[in-house]
Amino acid sequence: MFNIKMTISTLLIALIILVIIILVVFLYYKKQQPPKKVCKVDKDCGSGEHCVRGTCSTLSCLDAVKMDKRNIKIDSKISSCEFTPNFYRFTDTAADEQQEFGKTRHPIKITPSPSESHSPQEVCEKYCSWGTDDCTGWEYVGDEKEGTCYVYNNPHHPVLKYGKDHIIALPRNHKHA
């Protein structure tokens, strides 16, 4: 009986020592990993990385949007987006006009200018970029020649839905994220 008690207590001590060793090794390994690189723009990051909420990341654009824009709702038909220097850009996507974000959009008619070589989408993006920090997104509806730009300045979280021939862009690392 004494042998059995001693064996159980020995096993228990060995198990505790093993758990302590595993914890020490795990904590040491965590300390050895380099800290995430701090950034303001994509150029601050390495190849294949993008600046998401102030740190360099290899997240896909869609995952980055979900991390950057808390409580965003994205229709399941929307499966991708692209990084641009200042925006997350979605094609065939529109804001849901029944939700708070979509209710307060402001239209801006864009017509081609012979002196300008910018596409209507570029003009729409520049309008939002040159505006105040209150621009929380832009949407373009039209073709390559002319269309309507909608500028959003509502800090509510966007609800995005599928919208054929719509382009919507949400600012990256924005104060209303």
From Swiss-Prot:
TM regions (residue ranges): 8-28
Topological domains, Virion surface: 29-177
Membrane topology: Single-pass membrane protein
Expression induction or repression: Expressed in the late phase of the viral replicative cycle.
Subcellular location: Virion membrane; Host cell membrane
Keyword Transmembrane: yes
Homology family: Belongs to the asfivirus inner membrane protein p22 family.
Name of the molecule in the record: Inner membrane protein p22
